[in-house]
């Protein structure tokens, strides 16, 4: 191919993966490709989410110098409020919203609802009173990490990284900024910049995984447009 894209978490550059990755890229380079490698943060490309990913682009050496350039970061960061505040509350009974697919509230225990009620937007488990902390979290997050679990998203900042388990309030800062619920599957998809009418197939866990594992649409578009520019130069 004239070009290829590889995307992964920054951990691919860690101790366990770095040698394997760079050995593979060296072989690709030897076979006739320029290799471009950079960490991009989705929030810089129209995604209301903090999401750092390694994006590697291969460009076949049909010319003397490489033509590809990474997209330039945008100045404006889209906040959670800008992205999802317009959505109505999902039904109390856990059913889908009648006009918005996958917009429903998860069932939460009384204790998890109490945890949400104790938090302000942007706060995680470090702000919970002792009686609402899970036993495994009674040690400071400075020691064991995971400070954002059992958290509410901020309104006026980007969201944390949407993971494959963002549908669970216990797995991260996935509580709605002001309503006492975790964000819906549709809200997660919007924070990944999928169109509101995008159709996902599967059960709740499968759809959450599809959304959380996806490359955010707006970031993919930004990189894709740069590849198109590169190919246009190539053909001219």
What are the roles of these predicted feature ranges?
Residues 1-143:
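Class I S-adenosyl-L-methionine
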Residues 103-236:
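C-terminal target-recognition/interaction regions appended to catalytic cores
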